[in-house]
C-alpha cells in the first residue's frame, strides 16, 4: 500500500473480530490514519483483509511489527492476550491502542505500564464512552460549579451481555470473561471523568449465579475519590 504525502499514522490491526468491525468506520473515516497491515490466526480472514484494503496480513503480531509501514498497533485480540500483544508491539517500538480491559490482572497491568515506559512508546486504552456528548456535557456542568460541588455519582447499567452469543473465553473469568472485564471498564471510565480525579479505594461484590454461564454476570462497586 502506498502512503500519501500527507502525514498519516500507519495502523496495524491485531485481531479482526467484532471490536475491529466496530472501530472500522472510525478508522476509514479519519484521514490521519491508514490501515497498512493486519494479523489474525484465521487465513481466510487475512485473505479478505488483503483484498478489501490492498494491504498485507501476517500470521502473528511479531511478523506484523517488522513491517516498516506500521507506526502503531490497534490490539483487538481476546482479553487474555492483551498483555502478550502489548509487550510485543512495545518492544518493537510501536505505539499502541488496546481495547479494554488493559489486562486481566493487576500484575499484568502494572507490567504493561512499566514496559511502555521503558520502551518509550505511547499507549491508549480503549474505553470511549467518556467521549459521548451527554457525558462531556455533564462534565462541563460539573466543572462550571454552577450547581455546586459534586457530592456523589450513582450509576446503574443493565444489558443482556451474558446471554448474547459468546465465545468460550468470554464465559471464563480466568481468561478475561464476564461483565467486570467487558462492561465495568466503561462505567469506571465515565465516573472517573465526571469525578475529575483519581480513585483511592474500591469496595465491590460480584454475582456468578448461572451454572450454564459460570462467570460474573453482575457486579456492584463503591468508588471513593482522593478529593472526597
Protein language model features and the residues they cover:
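N-terminal Rossmann-like dinucleotide-binding module
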Residues: 1-52
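Hydrophobic residues in well-ordered beta-strands that form the structural core
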Residues: 13, 59, 98, 123-125, ...
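A broad helix-preferring feature
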Residues: 15-23, 65-73, 121
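Short, Asp-centered acidic motifs that coordinate Mg2+ and/or phosphate
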Residues: 37, 72, 152
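Beta-loop-alpha module in the N-terminal Rossmann-like domain of NAD(P)-dependent dehydrogenases
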Residues: 53-115
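Rossmann-fold dehydrogenase core element
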Residues: 111-128, 148-153
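Predominantly a Rossmann-like dinucleotide-binding segment in NAD(P)-dependent oxidoreductases
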Residues: 129-213, 219-222
